[in-house]
Amino acid sequence: MSKAKQALYLIVSLLVIIADQLLKNYIVTNFKIGDEKTIIPGVLSFTYLQNDGAAWNIFSGQMILFYLISIAAIAVVIYYLFNPKYKNGLFDTGLALVLGGIIGNFIDRLHLKYVIDMLQLDFIQFNIFNIADSAITVGIILVFIYLIFISEKD
């Protein structure tokens, strides 16, 4: 992979981190825990929560475990992102999104000992999440699309 493409994928990761941290800072500055504000009626609200667990608050309070998993996941994603054997735009974009999401939540865990969540979908019963979580989810979907439908053709 050329250095320009490597830089592009790192920029994608960086944009995820910046957007995630800026929205989290906005929420912390303007909301109290539990406060809710409708953004798009019937679609999206901001609800400020502090999550000291993982998805659905599993493993609540297990910070050492989250640190180790985050560091290992970052290492694995970087390995695949920069390994010339695994090169595909969809795959690499997915990995860049996952990397940005992992780092975005890792920053919270290191600094605050919890993750700030705020995005609530009002049209479906779903947990409150953040931009980093969204990037990880979309990134994993892109990686799976590549692995299931494209990788055999490469």
From Swiss-Prot:
* BP-aspect Gene Ontology terms: proteolysis
Q: Where are the transmembrane segments?
A: 8-28, 58-78, 88-108, 131-151
Q: Is Ribonucleoprotein one of the keywords?
A: no
Q: How does it sit in the membrane?
A: Multi-pass membrane protein
Output the PANTHER family linked to this UniProt entry.
LIPOPROTEIN SIGNAL PEPTIDASE
Taken from the UniProt entry, a GO cellular component term is: plasma membrane
The annotated pathway is:
Protein modification; lipoprotein biosynthesis (signal peptide cleavage)
- Write out the catalysed reaction: Release of signal peptides from bacterial membrane prolipoproteins. Hydrolyzes -Xaa-Yaa-Zaa-|-(S,diacylglyceryl)Cys-, in which Xaa is hydrophobic (preferably Leu), and Yaa (Ala or Ser) and Zaa (Gly or Ala) have small, neutral side chains
Question: Keywords of this protein's UniProt record, alphabetized?
Answer: Aspartyl protease, Cell membrane, Hydrolase, Membrane, Protease, Transmembrane, Transmembrane helix
Q: Tell me, what does this protein do in biology?
A: This protein specifically catalyzes the removal of signal peptides from prolipoproteins.
Q: Name one GO molecular function term.
A: aspartic-type endopeptidase activity
Q: Might you give the EC number(s) for this enzyme?
A: 3.4.23.36
Q: Name the residues annotated as catalytic in the UniProt entry.
A: 117, 133
Protein name stated in the entry: Lipoprotein signal peptidase
What organism does this protein naturally occur in? Lactobacillus johnsonii (strain CNCM I-12250 / La1 / NCC 533)
